[in-house]
Design a protein with these regions (language model features):
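Glycine-rich, aromatic-lined ligand/substrate-binding cores of catalytic
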Residues: 401-437
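Bacterial N-terminal signal peptides
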Residues: 7-19
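Repeat-blade elements of multi-bladed beta-propeller folds
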Residues: 27-31, 66-84, 108-133, 166-190, ...
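Mature N-terminal segment immediately following signal peptide/propeptide cleavage
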Residues: 22-64, 70-73, 96
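N-terminal secretory signal peptides that target proteins for export/translocation
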Residues: 1-5
Length: 437
């Protein structure tokens, strides 16, 4: 999902004026807002006139590499990343550069966005750059020196052991709640990897306010789902896909990924809570309110790949605060987001045991009854290429030498296995879009 590009472009609808009621509608958070539903109430651009869009301006970053940034629009300013993890503020109407922040650290992977905080007087931009979280003045791009150490905190600190030999990167922005920024991080996918603790930092000082262990410590719920020493050695179970927030109720929703190693779990036997889990946490304290594990003992890298989207559903003449979580398997899980009660039944289905020495795959995995998966669930012979008779014959021969029995088929040492949908999904980090109207 990386794209080689240099330009950050904007298209503006040119043939009509913007009404005063719409001039202050922005894009204040990653994927549109804390609800992560990709929704904007702007309606001048629609299916009837979208073909009339023309390029209004283009900003040349002067760089090459993957550009995945979901820009924020705050007032008349656009905030985004360049491919090398520099932060830019542009005039949203003209594309003119207002300021650029260069940390001096060469960024090696795309970052998907920044986070914005204001109390009506101060305005901060929070930017993840490699192992660090920076706090910038949104008006001029200068570091806020009172935050952490000289305007930044080292995200490796406080996780486990010698932090200088660890790696964690905030490639998806944290989420703002009151005077907190709540973050996860992208961890290595092999040993050694730090645990994927969910942490909340004070936006003014950078001090840690709370932490939730996704690999539970002794005495914490879920500890029994790992080997006894896993909290000292196991890694990841991290939130790399972003979070959603019910701000009025003070609940943050955190989907996590698999534990390391992604495709081998003989050193972490058990269901491995809270890997591959949707967590509902009290945003004030980090206390777990409810959870749902989408994959038990993941050995397929079936992370929850995107933020959940928050919305309201009507059932039996009642309005239910709801949540939709997509998966790499193309499932859509629907929950009452206050209680964790499924809005459609979720059943456990049996799957084969692993034949890999030392590995113990879970014999059941969950699946929602509704809605139906949004991508194909099986690869069969009749789907293979028919471009030429020779190509078809080759594909059929190769396919018959593979194991292809559907979802959650454990890998084997003596035969290759088809993974379908592929490792990237299915659903991916863009997440679902919901029109709340």
């Amino acid at each position: 999902m990386n794209f080689t590009c240099r330009n950050l472009s904007a298209v503006i609808f040119l043939f009509c004026a913007v009404s005063p009621a719409q001039t202050n509608v922005g894009w204040p958070a990653y994927n549109g807002g804390p609800e992560a539903n990709h929704y904007s109430r702007l309606d001048q651009i629609n299916r009837a006139n979208v073909h009339q869009l023309k390029l209004a301006w283009s900003y040349d970053t002067g760089e090459k590499g993957g550009l995945q940034s979901n820009p924020l629009i705050i007032g008349h300013t656009l905030y985004a990343y360049t491919p090398s993890q520099k932060v830019v503020a542009l005039d949203a109407a003209t594309g003119k550069l207002k300021w650029k922040f260069d940390s001096g650290i060469p960024g090696t992977q795309p970052v998907r966005g920044v986070a914005y905080w204001t109390d009506g007087k101060q305005q901060f931009i929070f930017a993840g750059i490699m192992n660090f979280l920076y706090c910038l003045d949104a008006r001029n791009g200068k570091s806020i020196p009172s935050f952490g150490e000289g305007g930044r905190i080292d995200l490796r600190k406080g996780l486990r052991g010698d932090y200088q030999h660890q790696s964690i990167a905030l490639t998806t922005p944290g989420i703002i709640y009151k005077d907190l920024i709540i973050v996860g991080g992208r961890n290595p996918e092999s040993h050694p990897a730090p645990p994927g603790d969910i942490r909340a930092f004070d936006v003014h000082t950078g001090n840690l306010r709370w932490s939730f262990h996704t690999i539970p410590h002794p005495g914490e719920p879920g500890y029994e789902s790992w080997p006894p020493e896993a909290w000292k050695t196991a890694g990841a179970a991290n939130n790399w896909a972003g979070m959603a927030l019910d701000a009025p109720r003070g609940i943050v929703y955190v989907p996590t990924g698999s534990a390391v190693m992604d495709f081998y779990g003989a050193d972490r036997l058990g269901n491995d809570l809270y890997a591959d889990t949707l967590l509902a946490l009290d945003a004030n304290t980090g206390k777990r309110l409810w959870h749902f594990q989408g994959v038990h003992h993941d050995i397929w890298d079936r992370d929850f790949p995107a933020q959940p989207a928050l919305f309201t559903v009507q059932r039996d003449c009642k309005h239910i605060p709801a949540l939709a979580q997509i998966t790499k398997q193309s499932y859509v899980y629907l929950f009452n987001r206050l209680t964790g009660e499924p809005l459609s039944p979720i059943r456990e289905f049996p799957y084969p045991a692993s034949t890999v020495p030392g590995e113990v795959a879970s014999l059941t995995q969950p699946k929602p009854d509704r809605p139906e998966p949004f991508a194909r669930q099986h690869l069969t012979e009749d789907m293979l290429t028919t471009r030429t008779p020779e190509a078809h014959a080759w594909a059929v021969k190769a396919f018959r030498e593979l194991r292809s029995d559907g979802q959650f088929l454990p890998f084997a040492v003596d035969k290759q296995t088809v993974v379908f949908p592929g490792f990237d999904g299915g659903g991916e980090w863009g997440g679902p879009a919901i029109d709340p109207t």
